[in-house]
Structure formats: C-alpha cells, structure tokens
Amino acid sequence: MLPTELTLRTTKDGIRLVNVPVKEVESLCKPLRSWKSLSSDEANRHLKEFYDADCLRIKTTIKLSHATDAGFNLFGQRMIGYDMNSNTLNGRFYSPQDPTSMELSADIYIDRTSIEVFIDGGLYSYSMERRPDTNNKEGLHFWGNRIEVKDLQVFSVESIW
C-alpha cells in the first residue's frame, strides 16, 4: 500500500477530507504514454502494450455522455464501476463535485498484488487485492456506452525493494 496523506480541502459543498499519495511517490513514476480525447475502443487498443506490466500508474478522466454506467477493468477485475443514476462507485455511494459534468477522474496504482484508486483528486479512495480473472483476455479495458476517455496517461512505477 502507498503511503498517503490526509488533508482538508475546501469544496463547493464545504470542507472535505482528501486522501492522496505522499508527494515522494511522484519520484517513482516515469511517464510512458499520454493521449487525449479517445473513444473507449481507441483507449483499449493503446493500453494493449501494457498488459504484461507488473507495476503501472494510470491517470484518466472519463466522460459519460450516453452511458449511465461506465468503468475500467484489469483482466475482468473491476477497478472502477461508476453508476451515474444511483451515484455509486463500485457499489458505494459517491457523488462527484460537479454532477452535471458527467466526468470522473482517477489516479490508479497497480502493482503485483494490489490496486489503489484515488478518485477526483482524492475525494474518494480505495484499495483492493489484485485478482485478475485468468480466463479473461481483455487486459486493461474501459467499458460503457460511448464514453469518452478525455485524458489517459500511463506511467511506469519504480520498485522501492
């Protein structure tokens, strides 16, 4: 698990607790690729080269225009599942700062055994065990009806061991 910092941030809804990786984590990340304004199919094609990576950082912003739910999987394991109608993220309540924007940003750290996700600048964060479906061949996969991947950045992450 990454070391994180809890801070208070003033939002339009008042003061909120934010959880983000400590700034020193940035020094372990090396930019590999960056794209803007992609369809989910285009983004999925670009991500194929990273299927075998052990450790990655992926920063992305997705926009739901026609979809009511969308997300991002790793070999069938749901890392992000956002349902706009019920305001849930992976089955738990989450409402973005600007619900009318229909956008969700994520900073995702994937290593050999775990996944850590920081949503909308740390306003919502969670971690999970990395347990991909060995029969699933989709790799890193955005899903949702006609979603736009507004921004997609991939970084390698250096090991500290």
Protein language model regions, located:
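Beta-rich accessory regions
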Residues: M1-W161
